[in-house]
Every structure is written in structure tokens, then in C-alpha cells.
């Protein structure tokens, strides 16, 4: 009787874990379909990095303290680079 109960509980736990993992994979796949492709995201990241570093270099050449350009959309300028906040 105890063995049967343990087997049933084990199967139920495995089923719950499997269902949770399947839901997470499905959510990830939907996010990937809705979002931009990785190549476009990489291009956006490179543009942000370039804009921020160029802005700081221009200000340094003018004998002024580097006041970092504000990066938009959840990005922050640190060490002449835009980084995600």
C-alpha cells in the first residue's frame, strides 16, 4: 500500500514538473516569435554602444568632463558604453 502511494505521488510530482517546464518553453517560444530577431537586437546594441562612446569622446576632447549621454529604453551609459539597467 505504501509503495503504491509513493509511486502515485512520485508520478504526480513528475507530471507537475514536466507541465511547468513545458509551459515555460512555450512562453519563451512565444516571446521569441513576437520580439525582434537576434541579429536586429545585436545591431541595436552596437548602435547604442557606438553612440554613447562617441558622445563621451567628443566631450572629453573639448576639455570638459565627460557628461554621459542618456541612453533610452532601459539602458544606462557606464564607462563609455550603454549597458542594460
UniProtKB/Swiss-Prot annotation:
Coarse class of the protein's main subcellular location: secreted
Signal peptide: 1-22
Subcellular location: Secreted
InterPro entries (UniProt xref): Hwtx-2-like (IPR012625)
GO CC annotations on file: extracellular region; host cell postsynaptic membrane
Keywords carried by this UniProt record: Disulfide bond, Neurotoxin, Postsynaptic neurotoxin, Secreted, Signal, Toxin
Annotated propeptide span(s): 23-48
One family name in Pfam for this protein: Toxin_20
Alphabetical list of SUPFAM superfamilies matching this protein: omega toxin-like
Tissue expr: Expressed by the venom gland.
Disulfide bond positions: 52-66, 56-77, 71-82
One Gene Ontology term of the molecular function aspect: toxin activity
Assembly, per entry: Monomer.
Protein family according to the UniProt entry: Belongs to the neurotoxin 12 (Hwtx-2) family. 02 (Hwtx-2) subfamily.
Protein's job: Neurotoxin active on both insects and mammals.
Official protein name in the record: U4-theraphotoxin-Hhn1a
Annotated organism of origin: Cyriopagopus hainanus (Chinese bird spider)
Amino acid at each position: 500500500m505504501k509503495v503504491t502511494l509513493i509511486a502515485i505521488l512520485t508520478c504526480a510530482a513528475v507530471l507537475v514538473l514536466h507541465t511547468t517546464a513545458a509551459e515555460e518553453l512555450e512562453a519563451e517560444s512565444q516571446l521569441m516569435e513576437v520580439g525582434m530577431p537576434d541579429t536586429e537586437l545585436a545591431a541595436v546594441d552596437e548602435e547604442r554602444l557606438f553612440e554613447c562612446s562617441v558622445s563621451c569622446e567628443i566631450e572629453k576632447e573639448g576639455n570638459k568632463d565627460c557628461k554621459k549621454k542618456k541612453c533610452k529604453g532601459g539602458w544606462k551609459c557606464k564607462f563609455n558604453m550603454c549597458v542594460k539597467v
